[in-house]
Design a protein with these regions (language model features):
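Context-gated lysine
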Residues: 33, 37-40, 52-53, 61, ...
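Short Gly/Pro-enriched loop/turn and capping motifs at secondary-structure junctions
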Residues: 30-32, 69, 88
Length: 103
């Protein structure tokens, strides 16, 4: 799952307990096979973006919950977040986590 992928890519790094985190989630959906060539091109050019489920808030919850006790101790450390949905020929989810510096 996502936790295992994170552990491999981050070499097991866990953010400190007092960290304030910024999480950016990029969800790439498969282009529907029924899409015309013109529509597919518009989807891949980001002129058309996914408006189907899951909703952005559910994506954020699923991703952040799955990183509890893996990337951070609790997702309450996330103080800023963004979820963006796109189409791609390689469906996937990319997650970027940054620690916000104090002061």
């Amino acid at each position: 799952g996502l936790g295992d992928v994170y552990k491999r890519q981050a070499h097991g790094y866990m953010f400190p307990d007092d960290a304030m985190l910024d999480v950016r989630i990029f969800a790439f959906y498969e282009v529907p096979k029924s899409a015309s060539k013109k529509k597919k091109a518009a989807m891949l050019a980001q002129d058309i973006r996914p408006t189907k489920k899951p909703d952005f808030d559910n994506i954020g919850k699923i991703i952040c919950d799955s990183l509890n006790l893996v990337a951070y101790h609790d997702d309450s450390a996330v103080v800023d977040a963004q979820v963006r949905k796109f189409y791609s020929e390689q469906p996937r989810v990319e997650v970027v986590i940054k620690q916000i510096q104090k002061g």
